Amino acid sequence: VKSGVVQRGGASNISERVITSFDVRKGKPDPEARALSGGNLQKFVIGRELDRNPGILVVNQPTWGVDAGAAATIRQALIDLSRGGSAVLVISQDLDEIFEIADRIAVISRGQLSDAYPAGDLSAERIGLLMAGAHEVKEAPHAAHA
């Protein structure tokens, strides 16, 4: 953008870089966004934002509607962005995705945000208890098997 005007050449370069990096499948050479499938549009939007190397990124359901390979690419890109010093807030209902991406996990329940816990300190069961409204959740001791 120069003087408030989008420079077509620069936008085209960014688009092609994102299309290649995130394997966006386009039906024709220069498709409009509305011509992309939901999954391809998701890949393009996530890729475009990641290409900007933002200092802060908030994403909601980042891998919704994409295939497993694209989901892995998106997750790794979010991890790389975080490791590069950016703050990345991921909102997702996919616990596997959260455990793979997050350093810390918090849960919203009944309009309240729980404390953020190190991801390694949480289990799916503990997250379920937080979702049910528990504020302090202690891991139950494991029973010895006879």
Which residues does each PLM region occupy?
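Glycine-rich phosphate-binding loops of nucleotide-dependent enzymes
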Residues: 1-146
